[in-house]
Amino acid sequence: MEADFVIIGSGSAGSAMAYRLSEDGRYSVIVIEYGVPDVGPLIQMPAALSFPMNMETYDWGFSSEPEPHIGGRSLVTPRGKVLGGSSSINGMVYVRGHACDFDHWSQSGARGWAYADVLPYFKRMENSQGGQEGWRGTNGPLYVQRGKRDNPLFHAFVEAGHQAGFEVADDYNGEKQEGFGPMEQTIHNGRRWSAANAYLKPALKRPNVKLVKGFARKIVLEGKRAVGVEIEAGRTFSTIRARREVIIAASSINSPKLLMLSGIGPAAHLKEHGIDLVADRPGVGQNLQDHLEVYIQQECTQPITLYSELNLFSKARIGVEWLLFKTGDGATNHFESAAFVRSKAGVEYPDIQYHFLPVAIRYDGKAAAQSHGFQAHVGPMRSKSRGSVTLRSANPREKPVIKFNYMSHEDDWADFRHCVRLTREIFGQAAFDPYRGAEIQPGAHVQTDDEIDNFIREHVESAFHPCGTCKMGAVDDPMAVVDPECRVIGVEGLRVADSSIFPRITNGNLNGPSIMVGEKASDHILGRTPLARSNQEPWINPRWQVSDR
């Protein structure tokens, strides 16, 4: 079996590439996916988001090694093992990232990936329902909507931010990210709008696109040229050959693992596992980054939260309404207000993100409070801690060693203390006076630096945004894995295009920029002239040097 292009992974970037590479009919595309079909309400119903990311059926089941700086805790790292990849199990929050994120990429060696370069690709991929005119796309495959924000707590959160002196941002994916405002969702007609729904399924209707179910074991190379992929399907091993190129889009965990199993990575590490060296790239598996967050939870004195919907009868009613009409509380992820703010004067653009939720509950669906409550998920966006993904053995079936080194940099602790105290300030504003009860978490007794640090150590959670393990950069950067056209340095006919190529993590959730990578990489792969650069200038707070708001 062979095709012009062989893509490993049907996730955010992989699905976008399958769609674009096959678009004009000139080239054939095979997409290799080990995961299951994305069918059923647990995947497609937005409110059911806590289920698929905790189910072996849909998730690769990765966890970090015990993390020494957070008390030896091992944090789960869900990655989608399903059509659509992690876009089929994520929280459906849509964030492009800040303009300065991409300018930093370009300045660090990823030339051609500045904000002016990537903004046209964000516009090409979007079908924005209500975003800022002129800054948003309206004809792309990816539907992006805003929630209804029926609950008064959503408006209280935005008003509280304004009362605290922060900006209001009506469209954080438009000209101005900084401020409090509505959150955007990849939901369409009441359904999760994953990369599979947006890109892969339309592509699979074309005669030149084929989906092959199989476990990718390694890249097949002839000398230093990639010519195919060895896959395992059942008990059968076979090779799918690529006439032009192999493109890895297997996630920030599996992409570096696959490179190393194929002889591309740190020479000493590969030798340790008896793998023949093809290209010594010490950056493969390094530069691992993530976002962490804590939940600040408050009791609500009025019975207006989602707590009323957590009983079995209400869940059944919500499920039936969604199954019949794709409406109601099942048709939203309930993240409908957000904020991006700066932590201190001298910080040029936001480095803290908020998700607001009108219930006190964990991501795994367990209620933290036995009564009405609300919460903010808050965390710093630019941690200085860095980790790694390395091989546990040369067995492709064995999960890799994942070490994030969470909270290993002292600045991360100071940033999180500020996040906790800032959230208390926001919840203390007059807008919350009609609703505010006692603080559930951390609790009013947690006040000193040491007490807050202990709370963070025990309760900090991953936001599930791993990236950076196949860093994009200049060809003379010894830690770069791919060049600015996503080509693996030192190997021909092989590219990586997913969140693993991010030089540095972006502001916010990663599904949006991952899809953008797939869109832009497609033009590089096809040898097209990139879309014309934008001349639109993003808003930067004129007070950034003297004030945090």
Curated annotation (Swiss-Prot):
The organism of origin for this protein: Brucella canis (strain ATCC 23365 / NCTC 10854 / RM-666)
Protein name: Oxygen-dependent choline dehydrogenase
Keywords: FAD, Flavoprotein, NAD, Oxidoreductase
Source species, domain of life: Bacteria
Record's catalysed reaction(s): choline + A = betaine aldehyde + AH2; betaine aldehyde + NAD(+) + H2O = glycine betaine + NADH + 2 H(+)
Pathway assignment: Amine and polyamine biosynthesis; betaine biosynthesis via choline pathway; betaine aldehyde from choline (cytochrome c reductase route): step 1/1
Residues of the active site: H465 (proton acceptor)
The UniProt record lists the keyword NAD: yes
Gene name for this UniProt entry: betA
PROSITE patterns attached to this UniProt entry: GMC_OXRED_1, GMC_OXRED_2
Keyword Nucleus recorded: no
Lineage, broadest ranks: Bacteria, Pseudomonadati, Pseudomonadota, Alphaproteobacteria, Hyphomicrobiales
Family membership: Belongs to the GMC oxidoreductase family.
Residues where FAD binds: 4-33
